[in-house]
From Swiss-Prot:
Protein name as annotated: Ribosome maturation factor RimM
Region (Disordered): 1-33
Boundaries of every PRC barrel domain copy: 167-248
Gene name tied to this protein: rimM
Taxonomy of the source species: Bacteria, Pseudomonadati, Pseudomonadota, Betaproteobacteria, Burkholderiales
Matching PANTHER family: RIBOSOME MATURATION FACTOR RIMM (PTHR33692:SF1)
Cell compartments where the protein resides: Cytoplasm
UniProt keyword list: Chaperone, Cytoplasm, Ribosome biogenesis, rRNA processing
Listed HAMAP family: Ribosome_mat_RimM
Top-rank taxon: Bacteria
GO cellular component labels: cytoplasm; ribosome
Family: Belongs to the RimM family.
Organism: Paraburkholderia phytofirmans (strain DSM 17436 / LMG 22146 / PsJN) (Burkholderia phytofirmans)
One MF annotation (Gene Ontology) recorded for this entry: ribosome binding
Disulfide pattern: none
Amino acid sequence: MSERDSGSSGRAKAAAAVAAATPRAKTSGPAPFGAFVRKPVEKAEGKAKAQVANAGSGAAEMRMETVESWPADAVEVGAIVDAYGLKGWVKVAAHADAGHGGDALLSAKRWWLIKGQERKSAPSLQAKMHSDSVVAHLGGVTDRDVALALRGSRVYISRSEFPALGADEFYWVDLLGLDVVNVAGVNLGKVADMIDNGAHSVLRIEYPDTDKSGKPVIGERLIPFVGVFVKTVDQAAKQITVDWEADY
């Protein structure tokens, strides 16, 4: 799963709903980092418009990469699942729909790929939506056989190439690690994951706790990312304020 606040905070109001990306591989569990959630006061409009991305500057061919050359802000956004057609296009199962974070695959100039221990990158010459998948032509992928050899590759995009979001919209990856406090100022823990339960996004928060024997354990809280509970998201302060009691 992973989130950007394009404003200074994401203030929620009374009537709240959250739009979250629909993971391709699963419908619950940790959030795919390519997804985003809108501010808790606003419903998503499902703008899954087809887009085409043309490669800009840089080498036109695929190249080998190392851990050292890998971008520090690389975010996993999908996986290559098959070849598409005969001319070297690949089919990608994105972690998020276009309009819900999957646009990064359509707009990025360069894709970064991991398969096993092998790392590669290639310019995205063209990418577009096809049904519920993304299909793309990468530099150096000249025919179907080369495309088939990329099956199973995990696809990463540099966070700096993610599309800009509207006010009070957040990429999940940018919410991870933020402190969560309630309106009374009580620290509830840190965001460990985001979960999409099909109806809305859920913050999974971890905090230090003890079991019945007094042994230190990691506690967990699940707080729906909806306006009735989420009051502000302040990325500058690395803090989310919620209307949620510590003993809930």
